[in-house]
Amino acid sequence: MKQAIGFIDSGVGGLTVVREVLKQLPHEQVYYLGDTARCPYGPRDKEEVAKFTWEMTNFLVDRGIKMLVIACNTATAAALYDIREKLDIPVIGVIQPGSRAALKATKNNKIGVLGTIGTVESMAYPTALKGLNRRVEVDSLACPKFVSVVESGEYKSAIAKKVVAESLLPLKSTKIDTVILGCTHYPLLKPIIENFMGDGVSVINSGEETASEVSALLDYHNLLDATDEEIEHRFFTTGSTQIFKDIAKDWLNMPDMIVEHIKLGK
């Protein structure tokens, strides 16, 4: 029987990481939990985010996952190291992979980070980036409206273009040549963000680098699945199954996917 890779996020954003993982590892089975009922996590305090992250983690661990991907930057900043220390399966977040990808891309060591309020206030990206390259200069910008635009399914709309333009205006006057999408919801806005920032700026989706690290970690622990056993992906949400499904089936190209509603916490 296949063991799944578990993915957790505050909503649908982590599906951007799932998509990259399934591109690289098509034989793997995915269990995904999006806590859309309590989304967004960005404005919440660290202790509350850590509590929610543990609730999601325990739900998937109880279902026998072989690895956990915290596919949410805010949750990674709040709880990655505690969860990694206490679980006996491999655990990975999205901040270190995103930082490594940005440092590969930048030519002038000036990097912008777009994130939730929680991620920006945590200083997780500047810490990770400067830990890898002390010369790097980091401009962080909280974009709290982006998550609601994505969760409402408006990420291709004129509203999205307006919100992106208004939110990113402060970055246009900087000399950054690379921008990290420091929230897994943001890659759904990547075409609009790229268009606004212009050709001279590389826009980094940490999902690709995270997928590569998932593959390497599974290989290291001898957990890669190359069998042709039937794959049964499972998707769980604490919010509306229909809204989740509408976004997920489009993003993952899974028209027949089934989404299960669950409750977490009290």
Swiss-Prot record:
Substrate binds at residues 9-10, 41-42, 73-74, 184-185. One of its GO terms (molecular function) is glutamate racemase activity. Its EC number is 5.1.1.3. Pathway: Cell wall biogenesis; peptidoglycan biosynthesis. It comes from Listeria welshimeri serovar 6b (strain ATCC 35897 / DSM 20650 / CCUG 15529 / CIP 8149 / NCTC 11857 / SLCC 5334 / V8). Keywords: Cell shape, Cell wall biogenesis/degradation, Isomerase, Peptidoglycan synthesis. This is Glutamate racemase. It is an enzyme of class 5 (isomerase).
